[in-house]
From Swiss-Prot:
<dbReference type="GO" id="GO:0006351">
    <property type="term" value="P:DNA-templated transcription"/>
</dbReference>
<feature type="region of interest" description="Alpha C-terminal domain (alpha-CTD)">
    <location>
        <begin position="251"/>
        <end position="340"/>
    </location>
</feature>
<dbReference type="GO" id="GO:0046983">
    <property type="term" value="F:protein dimerization activity"/>
</dbReference>
<protein>
    <recommendedName>
        <fullName>DNA-directed RNA polymerase subunit alpha</fullName>
        <ecNumber>2.7.7.6</ecNumber>
    </recommendedName>
</protein>
<keyword id="KW-0804">Transcription</keyword>
<keyword id="KW-0808">Transferase</keyword>
<dbReference type="InterPro" id="IPR011773">
    <property type="entry name" value="DNA-dir_RpoA"/>
</dbReference>
<dbReference type="InterPro" id="IPR011262">
    <property type="entry name" value="DNA-dir_RNA_pol_insert"/>
</dbReference>
<comment type="function">
    <text>DNA-dependent RNA polymerase catalyzes the transcription of DNA into RNA using the four ribonucleoside triphosphates as substrates.</text>
</comment>
<dbReference type="InterPro" id="IPR011260">
    <property type="entry name" value="RNAP_asu_C"/>
</dbReference>
<feature type="region of interest" description="Alpha N-terminal domain (alpha-NTD)">
    <location>
        <begin position="1"/>
        <end position="236"/>
    </location>
</feature>
<dbReference type="InterPro" id="IPR036643">
    <property type="entry name" value="RNApol_insert_sf"/>
</dbReference>
<dbReference type="GO" id="GO:0005737">
    <property type="term" value="C:cytoplasm"/>
</dbReference>
<comment type="subunit">
    <text>Homodimer. The RNAP catalytic core consists of 2 alpha, 1 beta, 1 beta' and 1 omega subunit. When a sigma factor is associated with the core the holoenzyme is formed, which can initiate transcription.</text>
</comment>
<dbReference type="GO" id="GO:0000428">
    <property type="term" value="C:DNA-directed RNA polymerase complex"/>
</dbReference>
<dbReference type="Pfam" id="PF03118">
    <property type="entry name" value="RNA_pol_A_CTD"/>
</dbReference>
<dbReference type="Pfam" id="PF01000">
    <property type="entry name" value="RNA_pol_A_bac"/>
</dbReference>
Length: 340
């Protein structure tokens, strides 16, 4: 009977996830995942994007209360904008909450001034992430007082669908965007492993409002997908599958790959062959200094091999317990599907 584990163990797996933040802000990041089986870049990229933009918990202002104002079709004395415009501006305020319970913030301002989000009295449990965001223009000698309620939630909740059905008279519900992720884009490019050049490389660009860092947002989205997909695994692994998994924990199966299967220059390949380096496991146990002492092996060859090892999440100078194993040829054959 075909081993069930071959359905997933024989697929190539990503050996690295690289995060690169943009210099101007920590709220934007480029995430690169490679290598992936052909088609998996689009599959994972689309799934991650949908979860990132819909399912993460965040905080938002859900209602406001202004003295003597009962609905959004009113005007506020001394305020240039009408209430509907003020509400639209308040929807753009980005908040971060350090507690799960709702909090009420207060705003007091005296004109003439431009009222901004930074003027809101938040307390210790709430943080305004864009304090320069403009709320309204207040005329000279006029005062503005307002209470703003913020809560934790997910997604986009319309004021008409608000879970606060019994708001007090004078408290106005507003549309709430809880999601801390502002934008997600992705693209898929080809990447190379050995002689195969059409594996997928997934490149994602994620921007948040600062409530969570992009790296954390991506991790949370992956965890949500993992939790949702777990239910579909309705079988038990066979004993040989469990044994293979246990054996694989000793060291990476990539160490069993022969170095002559790597796409090396003729000079580098000959140097390794002359130094009796047969498997990648033999190679990674050497230090860079050891390699540079090899006859005819220079810095160019060293950098070439380092780049290839990095694709497998390997490096020179690794400590590999019990290497080489006694049955190395048998193991290399058994795990051939895992690294090819």
């Amino acid at each position: 009977m075909l081993s069930l584990s071959k359905n997933w163990n024989t697929l190539i797996k990503p050996n690295k996830v690289a995060y690169e933040n943009f210099p101007e802000t920590n709220n934007k990041a480029k995430i690169v995942v490679e290598p992936l089986e052909r088609g998996f870049g689009l599959t994972l990229g689309n799934a991650m994007r949908r979860v990132l933009l819909s399912s993460l918990q965040g905080a938002a202002i859900t209602s406001i209360k202004i003295p003597a104002i009962e609905h959004e079709f009113s005007s506020i004395p001394g305020v240039k904008e009408d209430v509907s415009e003020v509400i639209l501006n308040i929807k753009g305020i980005e908040v971060k909450m350090h507690v799960a319970e709702k909090r009420i913030m207060k705003l007091k301002a005296t004109g003439p001034c431009v009222v901004t989000a930074g003027m809101i009295e938040t307390g210790h449990d709430v943080e305004i992430l864009n304090p320069d965001h403009v709320i309204c223009d207040l005329a000279k000698d006029k005062q503005l007082e307002m209470e703003l309620t913020c809560k934790v939630g997910k997604g986009y909740v319309l004021s008409t669908n608000s879970y606060e059905d019994n708001l007090p008279i004078g408290e106005i519900a507003i549309d709430a965007l809880f999601n801390p992720v502002k934008s997600v884009t992705y693209k898929v490019e080809n990447t190379r492993v050995g002689q195969v050049t059409d594996y997928d490389k997934l490149i994602m660009f994620v921007e948040t409002n600062g409530d969570v860092l992009p790296e954390m947002a991506v991790g949370l989205a992956a965890r949500i997908l993992q939790e949702q997909l777990q239910l579909f695994i309705s079988f038990e692994e066979q004993e040989e599958d469990k044994q293979v998994k246990t054996d694989a924990l000793l060291f990476s199966p990539y160490l069993l790959k022969r170095v002559d299967e790597l796409e090396l220059s003729v000079r580098s390949a000959n140097c390794l062959k002359n130094d009796n380096i047969i498997y990648i496991g033999d190679l990674v146990k050497r230090t860079e200094s050891d390699m540079l002492r090899t006859p005819n092996f220079g810095r160019k060859s060293l950098n070439e091999i380092k780049e290839i090892l990095a694709k497998f999440n390997l490096r020179f100078g690794m400590d590999v317990p019990d290497w080489p194993p006694e049955n190395i040829q048998e193991l290399s054959k058994r795990y051939e599907d895992s690294y090819n």
